[in-house]
Amino acid sequence: VFDEVLVFDFQSLYPSIIRTFNIDPLSYAGQRRGGEPTGGSTAQEPPIRAPNGAVFRRQPGILPELLDRFFERRAEAQAKGDAVASFVYKIIMNSFYGVLGARGCRFAGSDLAGAITSFGQRILGWCKDFLEDLGYTVLYGDTDSLFVTVLAGPAAAEARTAAPALLLDGQEICGRVNRALEEYLVETYGVEPRLTLRFEKRYDRFFLPPLRGGSGQAEKGRAKGYAGLLAGEEATESPAADAHAGATPTGNASAATTSAGTFDLRKRIEVRGMEAVRRDWTDLAHEFQLRLLELLFLKRPLEEIQGYIRELVEALYRGELDDKLVYRKALRKSISAYTRNTPPHVKAAALLPRSEQRGLIRYVITREGPQPEGWISAPPDYDHYLERQLMPIASAFTEVLKTDLEALFGRGGQLWLF
């Protein structure tokens, strides 16, 4: 868990790369071989070479000019408050990269699409190095974003003492990066930069789970997988919520308070790519993960978290959470089409009347296997939900809590039940 994390992203990164580096089927001059691009160039007008080796002439291409117009139209739509038009232009602009990598497009080419992604990686890498030279630590990055902690490292400690407000000023940091990036692109590639890094948000606390089966900082985080507590007033639970934190396993303690009044802590928690926002996990798993995040962001002691987990599991085995055990998965083809293997939702669908064997299948794992909701004839398999829903989620928290699953759940997962 990290404190004070700033999130930066590039506005329309791939379209901006196409515009900046003149990436276009007509300007493409081949791959550089033996020091020269296969398509030739002139000494007066040296070509632009992408990190993947693709070379582009500087004569303006069609796609960059189209994107210039679309950027202008989108800016006009945003100025008018026309959210629909702005969204349409955004989708169209982002599709340019997709069609260049799609076989069905007559202008597609792996070198063109590869040039865009390689420039993206080069630019994100340059920004990461620049920020770290300033004393910040880049925790995580995806296609067009960087997550930066400002309260780490000796350089940051020195800056924190000298100018704490400036250290947390995302707009100021953006300005420094953009000015330096512009100089780098002009000096290195001789282009007119059209790339703009934006300050998106700040998290008071930020959780980056490790990869399943991995450990260590290098293996933390999955693509789009993280959770953060959006910046706001200091999060402290109210006495009433605190008293019921363990008594109601499903998250009764989401209410929090400050000296200014009461607010809902859970509304400030953003989750991306984790089980809490995935439909193929049960409500039991969703609420369990959100509650663990709340306790983590509130900096609750390990004993309190263990107590919450214990009461949750006891409630599960008492049958008090049966309404939260439903899986939901779409049936995308007929049951008879599943020949090699039969997934649980297909087995459940096979028990339904033929007229209902379609669309979203809601089912429960019972002691007799998966059964569709409304047609359940056997008790739920609580061991399944403990081992497949609760324990995998808890495993992501063991490193930050400096414990293990045995300590959280008891040996075998349910030691206290016997």
Task: Enumerate the language-model features and the residues they cover.
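Active-site loop/lid in soluble adenylation, ligation, and acyl-transfer enzymes
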Residues: 54
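Active-site cores of enzymes that catalyze phosphoryl transfer or operate on phosphate-rich substrates
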Residues: 58-105
